C-alpha cells in the first residue's frame, strides 16, 4: 500500500510527481502568484468519479464543483437547521449565574446540611448566625403537646412518651413545612411565600399576635404582598474604628434610604401592608412601607404629640437610647454584625431591605398575568443600579443586591466581558484574511466553519445532554474556540498551498486531507481530552465547562475537516484566478503595491537558482503541524565538535521584492537557528542539568499548593456584587429576609409625654441584664448658651470672659463675628446623645495686676480646675468629640504667656496661643450649630426613648462557637431538587423531604440513650458540649416522666441566658423532626484532609449506635451533618477532581504521543517536557499566592493538553527530517540526532513561536475581564504558553539532541508496535486496579467515594 493511501502513516510529501510543464515550472500553485491562472487552465476537471479507491473518490468529490458546493451547502445548512430546531422547540438557553454552581451540591454532606438548613430557614429564614428568641407560640405549642402526653401517661396510656420542649430558642427553631405557595414561588425563582415570610419574625408588634400578620399577605389588595426586595448593606470605612453608629454615617444612610423612596416609580411598586395605614406621616408616600431598617429607630417622626418609628423623621434621635430600645427585640441582631453586644454598641455594617409589593396596580392578584408583573418590576428595579452605584462616600460604602439586581449585574458584567471576545475574534479574523492572501472566500468559510461548529455544539449540549444553562465559565469558549478553530483552518490552507509539487488536483486534495486531517486530529484529540477530563469533576461549573469545551473542539475539527477541503477545491478552480486578477488590477491602478497585499511568494520560498523545483514555505505560519519539505537542501550548520557537511541555504534568503514581514520572519528563523545551535549542540548538557534542578525545586513547591480555603471569586474583589457574595459566604447574608423586624412593626406609636414602658412590656422584651438607669433631661431643658466677651488694652493681649448670662458688665465688650471670634455658642448642661464630653470653664484672678486689665480671666479645660494655680470652677457643659448632625466645630487653647488666659475661636489660626499638642487645655469640640434656630429643632432631635427608667432588658445573643457544631438529625430524609428551576446568583437549595414515619414520643427513649452515648465519647464531643434536646424553659423536670432513659441527660455549658443549638420542627400539632447539637472537638482551623478523618469518626460511631436500635425504627434514617463538613468536602473533592483530571489528561496524551511517535526515545523527551512545564506553572501559581480552587482545577488538566502541542510538533519535524538524512551522517548517530533536531527547529521554529505569540495576544483581553475566572484563566493560559515555548526551544531540543534515535523512521510496523504497547499498558493498569480491589485496597474516586 502506498504511503499516500495510508491515513496514519502518510508523511507530508508524496513520492510520485509528474514532470512539470515548462510554462508552469516554478509556479507554486493556483492563485498564489499572478501567473497562477495559466496553470489553473491546464487542469482537467474529472467528469465522473474514479472507479476504485476511497481516497481517489474523496479527492474527486472535493475537486468536483458540484460535489464541493453540495458539501458546503450541507455544512452550512445542517448546523442552522439543528440550531433552529433547538431554539424553536426547546427552552431558551440561559446563563447559569447560580453561586451554587461552584459548590458540590450532590455530595452527601452538602445535601444533608442543606436539608437541615432549609428546614430551619423555612421558619425564621436564617442559617449560619445565632438564631434569635422565637415567639411564645412555639413553646406554647410544645408545652401543649407535652401536657397531652403526660395526661395520657397518668391515664394509663404509656405507649407514647413525650419529649421535653423549649420555650424559646435563639438557635432552636420550630419549623413549619413550606407551603405549596412557597414551592410555587421558588419555581418562579422569587422570594419565599408570604406565609413563610410571616414567620421570619420572632416577635410581633405589641398588642397583636404575630400570627395575625398572615391576613396582610394573602389579601388581594394592590401591593399588599411583600414579594420582591432590594438588599442594602452599609459598610463603615474611612477610619480605624469602623463603627457604623456615628451621626455622620447614620445621616448618610438615612439620606440614601430617602432617595430610594423618592425614586421615580417607587410608589407604584412599593409594599403597602395594612399596618402602615396607622402611621400618619407615611401618608405623603401613599402609605408605602419604609425600608426595613434601624433608621426607623434613629429617625422617628412626631405627629400629634406621638412618636412614630417609621424612619421618616428629619432629625437624628439619641443614638444610644435608640439602640437600647431596638436591642430589646431579638430581631435587632438581624441588622448588625456578630461583634455587637450590650457592652460593645458598635457594628461595622448595617443591613437594610426595601420591600416591593404585589399585585401591581391593574392586576387582580399575584397570579394574574404573573410574568407580565414580574417583567414590569424587573424593568423598574434595575433603574436603581445607576443611582445606588454613586451613593458610597468616604465614610460609608453602599452595597446593593437582591435577586433581580444580582441577576442584572451578573448578566451585564458577563455581556460586557463578552464584548472583549470580539476584540480577540476581530484580530484573529484579520490574521486569517492576511494569511489567506487577502482571500475573502477562504476567510469567510474559515470563520463560518468555526461559528457553525459552535451551533452544533450548543445543540448537543442543550438537546442531547439536556443541560438547560450555559455555565458562566463557558464564556471562556468565546475567547478560546476561535483560536483553536483558526489553527485547524490554517493547517488545511497552508498544507494545500505547500503541495505545489502535485500537478493533479485530486492528488493535491488527497494529500491535503491526509496530512492536515491527521495533524489536526491529533491536536484536537489532545485538546478535547484535556477539556473532557473536567467532566468527572463534582463541581457543577467545572463539569459543564469541560463538557461544553470538549464538544466545541470536537465539532470544530469535524466542521473544518469537511468544510475547508470543499472551500479550497472551489477556491482553486474559480476564486483564486479572480482574486489574482483583482489584485493585479488594483496594483496597476494605484501604481504601487498595496501595503496590505501579501504576494504569493510570502507563503512559498523563492525559486532556487537554476530553476529547480520550488521550495516549501519559508515563513512557516502553521501552529499545528510541521510541513517539512524533504526536497529542501539542508542548511549549512556549524555544530562545533560535530563534523557535518555544508549545504546551501539560498532558500533562506528572501527575494528582492519580499516585503518587510517576510524579512522579519527570516530574521526570526535565523535567530532561532543560532539559539537552538547553542541549546541542542553546544550546551545541551548544561540545559539538561538546569532542567533537572528546576524540576526538583518545582516538585517541592508545587506540592505545597494548598486547596482553596474559600469559595471561588466570581468577580473582582472590589466590585459590589463580589463583596456581597463574600458577606453571604462569611456573614451568612444569604437569602435572609426579615420584613417585619423594623420599628414600624415592633413599636406602637408612643406619646412624647410618656416614654416609660409598663412592667408587662418590659418583661416581654428580653431576659438579659437590664440597662443601667440614667437620669437625663430633655433636649429643651438641657440646652444653654455660652456668651463670650473680651477686654482689649493697649499693649496687652485681649482677655476673654465666658458666661451663661448675656449681660455685659463693664469693662467687658461684646465680641464681633469675624477674625475667628465666637460671640456665643449652644451647649448642653447635661449629657445628651453623643454630647458626652465634659468641659469646665475655670475663672481666676491671679496675674491680673494692671489697673486697666479686667479683674478676672477664664479658660476652658477638660479636667478639673487647678486650684493650686488659682483657678476656680465657674460652670461646666457637655460637647461632642465627633461631628454630629447640625453641629459646628470650635477650637480652644490656653496661652503659655501671662496672663495665661484662654480663648475660643472658629479656626485654628486664632487659637495658636501655644505650639503644644492638643491636651486638656487645648483642642477642639463640636457644639450644636447656631445656623439651626432653636425653634426649628424638632421634638425628635436627640430624642431618647429610654429616658428615666430605661427600655427594659436587652435580648440575649449567644456567643459564636469555637468548634464545629455537629447536628444529629432525625425526621428529615433529604432534599427534593427535581422541580428546581433556579438560576440566581444565590440560589434556592430545593424543598425538604420529611420522614412521615418519625414519631418523637415513640422514639424518645432511643434518642435519650443515643445522646448519652455520643456525649460520653470524649474523642468526638467537648465536655459540656452535648445539647440533646432544645432547652430554654424550665421543663427539664418533665423529662424523667417521659421515659426512664431520659433521666440525667447531659446538660450543655451555656452562658447565662444562652439557649442551645438543638431544634425541633413542629407542623400541624405534631413534632416533625428533631436535631441534637454537639460541639465537636474538631478545630475549624485544621486542614481539610485532617478534618476528613474527624468526619469519618463521626460517621462510623453514629452508624454503630443506630445499628443497636430495633429493626424498622425511623431512627435508622438519621444522619449527622455539619457546615464544616460541607466546606471541607468542597476543598477535598475539588482537589481530587483536579488530580484525576490531570492524570486522565496525561494518560490520554501519553497514549496519543506514543502512537504518534512510535518510539519510546521520542516519547520520553515529550513526557519530560510536559512534566517540567506543568510543575513550573504550578510553582509559579504557588509563588503568586494562589490556591487550588475551581478555576485552578480546570487549568491543571488543560495544561497537559496545551503543553504537548509544541513538543510534538518538534518531534514530528524530527521524524520528517529523517526522511532526507544526508548519507554523510549515516555512521554517526550523535551527528544524526543533532542535525535532525536543527532541521526540525529550522522548519517549525517560526511556526511554534508565531503560534505562541498569537495565543498570548489572544488571551490579553481576558486580563481585563471583571469576571474573575475569565481573568485568571487568561493569565494561566498565557503563563503556560510562555513556559511551553521556552521549554520546547530549550529542554526538548536538548533532550532530542541527547537521547533521540538517530536513524529511526516511522513505519507501519513501528505504529502497530506502539499501538500494541499502549493497549498492553492499559490492560496491565486495569489488571493492577482489579488486584488492588481484590486485596481490599480502596481506590478513591473523584466524587469522594471509593471503589
UniProtKB/Swiss-Prot annotation:
Keywords: Cholesterol metabolism, Cytoplasmic vesicle, Differentiation, Endoplasmic reticulum, Glycoprotein, Lipid metabolism, Membrane, Nucleus, Steroid metabolism, Sterol metabolism, Transmembrane, Transmembrane helix. The keyword Zinc does not apply. It comes from Mus musculus. Belongs to the patched family. Expressed in brain, retina, testis and thymus. GO terms for cellular component: cytoplasm; cytoplasmic vesicle membrane; endoplasmic reticulum membrane; nuclear membrane. Induction: Down-regulated by thyroid hormone T3. This is Protein dispatched homolog 3. It is found in: Endoplasmic reticulum membrane; Nucleus membrane; Cytoplasmic vesicle membrane. The keyword Cytoplasm does not apply.
Amino acid at each position: 500500500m502506498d504511503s499516500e493511501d495510508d491515513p496514519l502513516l502518510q508523511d507530508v510529501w508524496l513520492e510520485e510527481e509528474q514532470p512539470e510543464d515548462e510554462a508552469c515550472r516554478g509556479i507554486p500553485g493556483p492563485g498564489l502568484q499572478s501567473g497562477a491562472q495559466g496553470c489553473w487552465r491546464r487542469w482537467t476537471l474529472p467528469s465522473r468519479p474514479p472507479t476504485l479507491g476511497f481516497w481517489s473518490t474523496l479527492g474527486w468529490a472535493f475537486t468536483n464543483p458540484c460535489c464541493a458546493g453540495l458539501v458546503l451547502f450541507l455544512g452550512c445548512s445542517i448546523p442552522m437547521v439543528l440550531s433552529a430546531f433547538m431554539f424553536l422547540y426547546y427552552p431558551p438557553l440561559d446563563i447559569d449565574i447560580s453561586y451554587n454552581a461552584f459548590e458540590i451540591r450532590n455530595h452527601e454532606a452538602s445535601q444533608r446540611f442543606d436539608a437541615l438548613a432549609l428546614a430551619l430557614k423555612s421558619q425564621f429564614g436564617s442559617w449560619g448566625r445565632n438564631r434569635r428568641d422565637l415567639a411564645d407560640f412555639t413553646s406554647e405549642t410544645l408545652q401543649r403537646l407535652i401536657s397531652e402526653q403526660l395526661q395520657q401517661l397518668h391515664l394509663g396510656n404509656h405507649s407514647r412518651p413525650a419529649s421535653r420542649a423549649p420555650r424559646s430558642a435563639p438557635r432552636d427553631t420550630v419549623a413549619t413545612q413550606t407551603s405549596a405557595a412557597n414551592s410555587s414561588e421558588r419555581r418562579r425563582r422569587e422570594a419565599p411565600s408570604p406565609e413563610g415570610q410571616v414567620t421570619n419574625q420572632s416577635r410581633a408588634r405589641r398588642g397583636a399576635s404575630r400570627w395575625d400578620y398572615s391576613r396582610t399577605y394573602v389579601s388581594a389588595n394592590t401591593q399588599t404582598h411583600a414579594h420582591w426586595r432590594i438588599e442594602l448593606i452599609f459598610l463603615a470605612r474611612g477610619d480605624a474604628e469602623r463603627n457604623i453608629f456615628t451621626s455622620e454615617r447614620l445621616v448618610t444612610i438615612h439620606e440614601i434610604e430617602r432617595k430610594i423612596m423618592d425614586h421615580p416609580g417607587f410608589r407604584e411598586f412599593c409594599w403597602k401592608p395594612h399596618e402602615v395605614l396607622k402611621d400618619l406621616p407615611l401618608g405623603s408616600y401613599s402609605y408605602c412601607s419604609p425600608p426595613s431598617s434601624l433608621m426607623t429607630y434613629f429617625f422617628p417622626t412626631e405627629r400629634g404629640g406621638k412618636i412614630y418609628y417609621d424612619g421618616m423623621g428629619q432629625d437624628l434621635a439619641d443614638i444610644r437610647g435608640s439602640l437600647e430600645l431596638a436591642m430589646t427585640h431579638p430581631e435587632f441582631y438581624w441588622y448588625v454584625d456578630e461583634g455587637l453586644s450590650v457592652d460593645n454598641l458598635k457594628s461595622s455594617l448595617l443591613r437594610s431591605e426595601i420591600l416591593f409589593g404585589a399585585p401591581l396596580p391593574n392586576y387582580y392578584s399575584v397570579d394574574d398575568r404573573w410574568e407580565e408583573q414580574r417583567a414590569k418590576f424587573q424593568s423598574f428595579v434595575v433603574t436603581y443600579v445607576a443611582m445606588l452605584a454613586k451613593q458610597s462616600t468616604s465614610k460609608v460604602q453602599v452595597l446593593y443586591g437582591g435577586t433581580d439586581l444580582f441577576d442584572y449585574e451578573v448578566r451585564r458584567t458577563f455581556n460586557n466581558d463578552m464584548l472583549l471576545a470580539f476584540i480577540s475574534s476581530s484580530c484573529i479574523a484579520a490574521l486569517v484574511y492576511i494569511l489567506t492572501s487577502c482571500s475573502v472566500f477562504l476567510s469567510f468559510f474559515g470563520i463560518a466553519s468555526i461559528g457553525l461548529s459552535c451551533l452544533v455544539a450548543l445543540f448537543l449540549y442543550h438537546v442531547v445532554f439536556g443541560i438547560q444553562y450555559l455555565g458562566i465559565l463557558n464564556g471562556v469558549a468565546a475567547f478560546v474556540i476561535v483560536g483553536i478553530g483558526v489553527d485547524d483552518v490554517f493547517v488545511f490552507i497552508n498544507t494545500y498551498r505547500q503541495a505545489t509539487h502535485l500537478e493533479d488536483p485530486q492528488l493535491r486534495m488527497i494529500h491535503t486531507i491526509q496530512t492536515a486531517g491527521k495533524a489536526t486530529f491529533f491536536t484536537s484529540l489532545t485538546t478535547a481530552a484535556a477539556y473532557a477530563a473536567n467532566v468527572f469533576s463534582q463541581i457543577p461549573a467545572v463539569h459543564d465547562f469541560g463538557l461544553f469545551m470538549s464538544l466545541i473542539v470536537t465539532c470544530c475539527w469535524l466542521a473544518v475537516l469537511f468544510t475547508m477541503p470543499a472551500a479550497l477545491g472551489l477556491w482553486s478552480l474559480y476564486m483564486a484566478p479572480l482574486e489574482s486578477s483583482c489584485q493585479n488590477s488594483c496594483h496597476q491602478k494605484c501604481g504601487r503595491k498595496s501595503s496590505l497585499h501579501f504576494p504569493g511568494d510570502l507563503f512559498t520560498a523563492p525559486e532556487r537558482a537554476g530553476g529547480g523545483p520550488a521550495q516549501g514555505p519559508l515563513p512557516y505560519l502553521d501552529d499545528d503541524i510541521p510541513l517539512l519539505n524533504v526536497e529542501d537542501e539542508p542548511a549549512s550548520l556549524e555544530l562545533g565538535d560535530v563534523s557535518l557537511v555544508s549545504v546551501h541555504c539560498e532558500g533562506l534568503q528572501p527575494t528582492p521584492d519580499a516585503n518587510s514581514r517576510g524579512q522579519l520572519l527570516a530574521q526570526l528563523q535565523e535567530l532561532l537557528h543560532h539559539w537552538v545551535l547553542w541549546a541542542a549542540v553546544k550546551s545541551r548538557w548544561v540545559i539538561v542539568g538546569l532542567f533537572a534542578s528546576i524540576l526538583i525545586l518545582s516538585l517541592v513547591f508545587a506540592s505545597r499548593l494548598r486547596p482553596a480555603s474559600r469559595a471561588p471569586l466570581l468577580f473582582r474583589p472590589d466590585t459590589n456584587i463580589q463583596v456581597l457574595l463574600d458577606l453571604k459566604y462569611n456573614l451568612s447574608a444569604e437569602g435572609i429576609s426579615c420584613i417585619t423586624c423594623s420599628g414600624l412593626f415592633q413599636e406602637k406609636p408612643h406619646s412624647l409625654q410618656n416614654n416609660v414602658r409598663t412592667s408587662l412590656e418590659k418583661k416581654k422584651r428580653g431576659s438579659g441584664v437590664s440597662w443601667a438607669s440614667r437620669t437625663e433631661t430633655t433636649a429643651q431643658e438641657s440646652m444653654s448658651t455660652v456668651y463670650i466677651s473680651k477686654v482689649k488694652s493697649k499693649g496687652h493681649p485681649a482677655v476673654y470672659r465666658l458666661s451663661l448670662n448675656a449681660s455685659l458688665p463693664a469693662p467687658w465688650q461684646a465680641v464681633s463675628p469675624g477674625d475667628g471670634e465666637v460671640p456665643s455658642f449652644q451647649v448642653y448642661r447635661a449629657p445628651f446623645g453623643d454630647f458626652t464630653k465634659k468641659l469646665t470653664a475655670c475663672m481666676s484672678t491671679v496675674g491680673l495686676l494692671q489697673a486697666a486689665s479686667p479683674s478676672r480671666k477664664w479658660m476652658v479645660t477638660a479636667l478639673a480646675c487647678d486650684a493650686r494655680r488659682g483657678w476656680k470652677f465657674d460652670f461646666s457643659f457637655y460637647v461632642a468629640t465627633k461631628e454630629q448632625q447640625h453641629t459646628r466645630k470650635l477650637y480652644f487653647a490656653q496661652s503659655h504667656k501671662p496672663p495665661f488666659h484662654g480663648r475660643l475661636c472658629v479656626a485654628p489660626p486664632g487659637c495658636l496661643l501655644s505650639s503644644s499638642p492638643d491636651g486638656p487645655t487645648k483642642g477642639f469640640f463640636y457644639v450644636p450649630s447656631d445656623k439651626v434656630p432653636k425653634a426649628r429643632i424638632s421634638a425628635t432631635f436627640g430624642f431618647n426613648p429610654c429616658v428615666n427608667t430605661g427600655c427594659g432588658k436587652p435580648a440575649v445573643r449567644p456567643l459564636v462557637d469555637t468548634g464545629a457544631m455537629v447536628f444529629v438529625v432525625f425526621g428529615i430524609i433529604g432534599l427534593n431538587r427535581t422541580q428546581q428551576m433556579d438560576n440566581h446568583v444565590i440560589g434556592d437549595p430545593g424543598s425538604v423531604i420529611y420522614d412521615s414515619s418519625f414519631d418523637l414520643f415513640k422514639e424518645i427513649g432511643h434518642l435519650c440513650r443515643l445522646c448519652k452515648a455520643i456525649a460520653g465519647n470524649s474523642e468526638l464531643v467537648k465536655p459540656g458540649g452535648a445539647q440533646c434536646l432544645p432547652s430554654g424553659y424550665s421543663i427539664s423536670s418533665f423529662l424523667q416522666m417521659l421515659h426512664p432513659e431520659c433521666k440525667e441527660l447531659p446538660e450543655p455549658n451555656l452562658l447565662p441566658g444562652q439557649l442551645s443549638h438543638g431544634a425541633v420542627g413542629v407542623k400541624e400539632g405534631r413534632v416533625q423532626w428533631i436535631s441534637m447539637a454537639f460541639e465537636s472537638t474538631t478545630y475549624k482551623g485544621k486542614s481539610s484532609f485532617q478534618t476528613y478523618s474527624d468526619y469519618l469518626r463521626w460517621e462510623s460511631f453514629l452508624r454503630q449506635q443506630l445499628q443497636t436500635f430495633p429493626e424498622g425504627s425511623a431512627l435508622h434514617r438519621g444522619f449527622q451533618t455539619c457546615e464544616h463538613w460541607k466546606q471541607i468536602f468542597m476543598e477535598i473533592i475539588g482537589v481530587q477532581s483536579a488530580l484525576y483530571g490531570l492524570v486522565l489528561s496525561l494518560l490520554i496524551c501519553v497514549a496519543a504521543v506514543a502512537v504518534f511517535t512510535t518510539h519510546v526515545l521520542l516519547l520520553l523527551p515529550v513526557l519530560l517536557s510536559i512534566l517540567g512545564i506543568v510543575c513550573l506553572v504550578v510553582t509559579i501559581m504557588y509563588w503568586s499566592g494562589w490556591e487550588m480552587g475551581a478555576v485552578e482545577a480546570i487549568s491543571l488538566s488543560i495544561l497537559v493538553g496545551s503543553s504537548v502541542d509544541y513538543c510534538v510538533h518538534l518531534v514530528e519535524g524530527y521524524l520528517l527530517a529523517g526522511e532526507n538524512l544526508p548519507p554523510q551522517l549515516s555512521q554517526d548517530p550523535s551527528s544524526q540526532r543533532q542535525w535532525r533536531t536543527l532541521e526540525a527547529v529550522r522548519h517549525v521554529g517560526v511556526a511554534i513561536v508565531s503560534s505562541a505569540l498569537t495565543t498570548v495576544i489572544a488571551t490579553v483581553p481576558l486580563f481585563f475581564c471583571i469576571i474573575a475566572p475569565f481573568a485568571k484563566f487568561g493569565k494561566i493560559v498565557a503563563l503556560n504558553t510562555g513556559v511551553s515555548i521556552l521549554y520546547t526551544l530549550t529542554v526538548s531540543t536538548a533532550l532530542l539532541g541527547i537521547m533521540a534515535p538517530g536513524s529511526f523512521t516511522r513505519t507501519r510496523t513501528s505504529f502497530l508496535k506502539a499501538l500494541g504497547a499502549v493497549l498492553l499498558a492499559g490492560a496491565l493498569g486495569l489488571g493492577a486496579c482489579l488486584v488492588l480491589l481484590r486485596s481490599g485496597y480502596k481506590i478513591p474516586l473523584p466524587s469522594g467515594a471509593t471503589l
